[in-house]
From Swiss-Prot:
PANTHER family: 2-KETO-3-DEOXY-L-RHAMNONATE ALDOLASE, 5-KETO-4-DEOXY-D-GLUCARATE ALDOLASE. GO terms for biological process: D-glucarate catabolic process; galactarate catabolic process; glucarate catabolic process. The gene is garL. Gene3D superfamilies: Phosphoenolpyruvate-binding domains. This is 5-keto-4-deoxy-D-glucarate aldolase. It holds the Pfam family HpcH_HpaI. It is an enzyme of class 4 (lyase). Binds 1 Mg(2+) ion per subunit. Can also use, although less efficiently, Co(2+), Fe(2+) and Mn(2+). Belongs to the HpcH/HpaI aldolase family. KDGluc aldolase subfamily. The record marks 75 as: Transition state stabilizer.
């Protein structure tokens, strides 16, 4: 059987510096994720760090996105090889790795997604990603079709951005604005000039190494500014945020 994710179109689009507009998925529900997958976003983050997701909730969401053109990206809870291996085996190919601060941590993320000798991924001959052993060329194709996006969200990460961006196998640099703001002494204020300066610096250094940059920006003016600064994969909202604001607006309309 053929695996319809080879070649990885999202990885290719990032490499070609094509703008990719995405959305965050935090509701952890296959129906809401299926609806989100119909909206036309280029990519969707299924969040395993701050949302109540695990293997048992990710699988039905991946099933719900089977017919969607939106590329699923999983944000792992932590940069840990066993966790990443399990997410690979259930069918994720695009990974967002939080809180990467050094080149060594970036290298670990890459190695965790690659079979030997390029990496340390454990081998199972039958799992959901290889359609339970029916994809004949899975081992040959897997390593080169994995996307690794590393998240910079600390002062140490900013200091090491050049080394991180230069890491072989890293496909893009993603800014975590909220944690970055907190790390720079401006908790809850990602709009502070110091934070904005750091964000632009990260974008510039990523570009200098030929790597695309991205960010979460649910405020339209912020998203458009980041695109002007050179970011190419931008998440412009979240299912949770849209649901909350829309229901609040609806209630307010009739309860005034």
């Amino acid at each position: 059987m053929n695996n319809d994710v080879f070649p990885n179109k999202f990885k290719a689009a990032l490499a070609a510096k094509q703008v990719q507009i995405g959305c965050w998925s935090a509701l952890s529900n296959p129906i809401s994720t299926e609806v989100l997958g119909l909206a036309g976003f280029d990519w969707l983050v299924l969040d395993g760090e701050h949302a109540p997701n695990d293997i048992s909730t990710f699988i039905p969401q991946l099933m719900a996105l089977k017919g969607s053109a939106s590329a699923p990206v999983v944000r792992v809870p932590t940069n840990e090889p066993v966790i990443i291996k399990r997410l690979l085996d259930i069918g994720f190919y695009n990974f967002l790795i939080p809180f990467v601060e050094t080149k060594e941590e970036a290298e670990l993320a890459v190695a965790s997604t690659r079979y030997p000798p390029e990496g340390i991924r454990g081998v199972s001959v039958s799992h959901r990603a290889n359609m339970f052993g029916t994809v004949a060329d899975y081992f040959a194709q897997s390593n080169k079709n994995i996307t690794i996006l590393v998240q910079i969200e600390s002062q140490q990460g900013v200091d090491n951005v050049d080394a991180i961006a230069a890491t072989e196998g890293v496909d893009g640099i993603f800014v975590g604005p909220s944690d970055l703001a907190a790390a720079l002494g401006h908790l809850g204020n990602a709009s502070h000039p110091d934070v904005q300066k750091a964000i632009q610096h990260i974008f510039n250094r990523a570009s200098a190494h030929g790597k695309p940059s991205g960010i979460l920006a649910p405020v339209e003016a912020d998203a458009r500014r980041y695109l002007e600064w050179g970011a190419t994969f931008v998440a412009v909202g979240s299912d949770l945020g849209v649901f909350r604001s829309a229901t609040q607006k609806l209630a307010d309309t009739f309860k005034k």
